[in-house]
Structure formats: C-alpha cells, structure tokens
Amino acid sequence: MHERHNIVTFVKEKLEKGEQVNLVSDQVRMPTYVDDLARACIGAAEKKAKGIFNISGEKHMSYLDIGNTIAEHFSLDKSLINHVKTSELNQAAKRPLTTGFDLSKSISTLNYSPTPFTDTLNILYP
C-alpha cells in the first residue's frame, strides 16, 4: 500500500537518505495534530455547539521552521535543508503565503487546546 507523504515523512525520509530538501521560508501554516481535530469534533458534538469553528495548530510556522523542527526531533542534518522563496518555485497552483486561523471561539466555546508541534512529534515519533 502506498502511504501518502506529509511534511514530516517527506522531510524525514529525504534527510535520512542524505538528500537536500528545499523548503520555503515565506509560506506560513499552522500544522494540526489529527487527535486535536478529533477532540474538537467530539467537543462540538457534546456541547451541541452551533456555528463555524476554526481548528488548527497553536502557532504559525514556515515550512522552513517545520523542517528544522523535524530535523532536530530526529537528530538529522539540518544543513541539508535549503531555504527558498515561493517565487523561486514553479508550483502548478498558486499558494497563499499565510494561512491560519483565529482559534479564540474554539478555545472559549469548546475548550480547545492545540497540541504544540514539538509535542505532536514526541507523541507520534517517541
């Protein structure tokens, strides 16, 4: 069975092979732990919450920051990670530089508490 890559497996596999990885420093995301998403859905159902709730990770991180954090977690060579700008890539689809969410409603209504990215790595890859 072919497993789909995510940023963690992509960076980890490349660095383990000693391959260079190009990661953008100007695209920012909020990585989300799937268990946090599941807990938020359960919380919304239990509270019979109405409306739209944003669920994501706790803070904005560039792909470069995410890659460096992954390399540190697995004790891999960060010097193989190349810093690039979005404008240098030939991406088929335009990507927004920043995506993220205001979590205040989810935090106050659902008692949502996002797991920090480093903690997520420790849980998934002890």
Q: Where are the language model's segments positioned?
A:
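NAD(P)-dependent short-chain dehydrogenase/reductase
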Residues: 1-29, 36
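A hydrophobic C-terminal alpha-helical subdomain
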Residues: 87-109, 114
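Amphipathic terminal alpha-helices
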Residues: 116-126
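Residues in well-ordered alpha-helical elements
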Residues: 35, 42, 64, 104, ...
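Conserved beta-strand termini and adjacent loop/short-helix elements that scaffold enzyme active sites
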Residues: 24-26, 83-86, 117
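Residue-level signal for the nucleotide or nucleotide-sugar donor/cofactor binding architecture
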Residues: 2, 29-32, 61, 101, ...
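Mid/C-terminal beta-alpha module of Rossmann-like enzyme folds, strongest
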Residues: 40, 47-92, 98
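Glycine-rich Rossmann NAD(P)(H)-binding loop
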Residues: 23-28, 53-60, 109
